[in-house]
C-alpha cells in the first residue's frame, strides 16, 4: 500500500508507464494504491525479456557444432593417422566417455529451456507449440542413442576389453569399420539438436508461430 500523495512526479510518471503490465489498478478512498495482477503473467513477461528461447537456440547450436566437429575433423584424422587397431579403439573410447558426460546433459538443459519458453508463451496466451516441438526434437537424440547406436557401442567396448585382456584382437580394417559406422550414426544424431535449433530460430524470428 502506498499513498499517491507521497509520490514524486517522476514516480507518478513511472506508475502511469506501468499500466500495460499491471492491468488492475484501484484507487481507494483513503488515497492508497492497490495493485492486483496475476503473478504468473508478470513473471512470464519478465522471463520473455530475458530471452529463454534465445539461450536454448544457442545451447542447441553449440551441441550440434560439437557433435559435427567429430565427423568433420576428429574421426577422419584418427582413422587416417592410426595404424594400430587397439589404439584406434582406445581413442574412440576416450571420445565416447567425454561426450557421454557432456552431451546428454546439454541436450536435456536445452530441452528444458525450450519447455520453459513454451510454458511462458502459453501463460500469456501466445503461440507456444513450436517451442515444445523444438525441445522434444532436441531431447530425441537421447532415445536415438539407445535404440540405434547401442549395438555399435557395445561392439567397440567389447573390442577394447579384448585388447586389454590380451584376447582375440579385431583387425585394423574391422576397427575402422566400427568407428566409421559410429561416426555416421553420431552425425545423424547431431541432426536432432540442429533441427531443434532451426525450429527455435524460426520461432525467434517470428517465421513459425503456432
Swiss-Prot record:
<dbReference type="InterPro" id="IPR013901">
    <property type="entry name" value="Anthrone_oxy"/>
</dbReference>
<comment type="function">
    <text>Monooxygenase that converts norsolorinic acid anthrone to norsolorinic acid during aflatoxin biosynthesis.</text>
</comment>
<comment type="similarity">
    <text>Belongs to the anthrone oxygenase family.</text>
</comment>
<feature type="transmembrane region" description="Helical">
    <location>
        <begin position="59"/>
        <end position="79"/>
    </location>
</feature>
<dbReference type="GO" id="GO:0004497">
    <property type="term" value="F:monooxygenase activity"/>
</dbReference>
<keyword id="KW-0560">Oxidoreductase</keyword>
<dbReference type="GO" id="GO:0045122">
    <property type="term" value="P:aflatoxin biosynthetic process"/>
</dbReference>
<feature type="transmembrane region" description="Helical">
    <location>
        <begin position="131"/>
        <end position="151"/>
    </location>
</feature>
<comment type="pathway">
    <text>Mycotoxin biosynthesis; aflatoxin biosynthesis.</text>
</comment>
<keyword id="KW-0812">Transmembrane</keyword>
<feature type="transmembrane region" description="Helical">
    <location>
        <begin position="188"/>
        <end position="208"/>
    </location>
</feature>
<keyword id="KW-1133">Transmembrane helix</keyword>
<dbReference type="Pfam" id="PF08592">
    <property type="entry name" value="Anthrone_oxy"/>
</dbReference>
<protein>
    <recommendedName>
        <fullName>Noranthrone monooxygenase</fullName>
        <ecNumber>1.13.12.20</ecNumber>
    </recommendedName>
</protein>
<keyword id="KW-0472">Membrane</keyword>
<dbReference type="GO" id="GO:0016020">
    <property type="term" value="C:membrane"/>
</dbReference>
<feature type="transmembrane region" description="Helical">
    <location>
        <begin position="105"/>
        <end position="125"/>
    </location>
</feature>
<keyword id="KW-0503">Monooxygenase</keyword>
Amino acid at each position: 500500500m502506498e499513498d499517491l500523495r507521497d509520490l514524486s512526479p517522476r514516480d507518478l510518471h513511472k506508475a502511469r508507464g506501468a499500466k500495460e503490465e499491471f492491468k488492475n489498478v484501484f484507487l481507494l478512498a483513503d488515497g492508497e494504491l492497490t495493485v492486483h495482477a496475476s503473478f504468473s503473467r508478470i513473471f512470464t513477461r519478465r522471463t520473455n525479456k530475458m530471452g529463454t528461447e534465445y539461450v536454448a537456440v544457442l545451447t542447441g547450436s553449440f551441441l550440434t557444432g560439437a557433435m559435427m566437429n567429430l565427423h568433420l575433423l576428429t574421426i577422419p584424422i584418427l582413422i587416417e593417422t592410426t595404424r594400430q587397431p587397439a589404439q584406434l579403439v582406445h581413442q574412440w573410447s576416450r571420445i565416447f566417455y567425454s561426450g557421454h558426460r557432456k552431451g546428454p546433459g546439454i541436450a536435456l538443459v536445452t530441452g528444458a529451456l525450450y519447455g520453459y519458453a513454451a510454458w511462458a508463451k502459453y501463460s500469456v496466451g501466445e503461440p507456444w507449440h513450436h517451442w515444445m516441438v523444438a525441445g522434444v526434437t532436441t531431447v530425441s537424440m537421447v532415445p536415438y542413442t539407445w535404440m540405434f547406436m547401442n549395438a555399435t557401442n557395445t561392439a567397440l567396448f567389447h573390442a577394447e576389453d579384448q585388447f586389454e585382456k590380451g584376447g582375440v584382437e579385431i583387425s585394423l580394417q574391422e576397427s575402422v569399420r566400427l568407428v566409421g559406422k559410429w561416426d555416421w550414426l553420431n552425425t545423424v544424431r547431431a541432426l536432432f539438436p540442429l533441427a531443434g535449433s532451426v525450429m527455435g530460430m524460426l520461432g525467434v524470428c517470428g517465421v513459425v508461430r503456432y
